[in-house]
Amino acid sequence: MENFINLITDVWNRGFFGIDLGSIISSLFIILVAFLLRGFIISVVINALSRLAGNTKTEIDDEILNALKKPLGLIPITIALYICTLILPLTGLIDEIATNVVKTFVVFTIFSALSNSIKPIFAALSAKSWLTIAIQLWLERAAKFIVWVIGIAVILDIFGIQIGPLVAGLGLFS
């Protein structure tokens, strides 16, 4: 019986790839709570802000808030991933990759919010614009494309991929 208890203790302490099961269970619990908080933030906090935005005279704040629902829902998940990197005893290359994944989530959240904000901004500007609808749609899509290209460039830079030679190799700025 004592050998069985020692076996259980050994499995608990070594766990999976040398990470104890307590840290793994804690990390999984934090991620689960983050997904629950994501729903809470989207349903409660955004709806409260929507009521406040509904009291204003303009519609642009309502539209931007609706556009930011999904990107703001990524914030708890990003924080949970960061906390998981602190809890788990990661070292070396695995720690570097985990840190880069958290940075990628931060960048993706920021650029997703920027990209989703473009449509309401263009909608607000379209009422006073002298541009045709086709040009406005083209400019809106071009702006979203540029935002995502910059976001992808930042993410590639996080993982150590040099962006300058890629852009120069394409011959875009010659």
Task: Report each predicted region and the residues it spans.
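Short, strongly hydrophobic alpha-helical membrane anchors
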Residues: 1-21
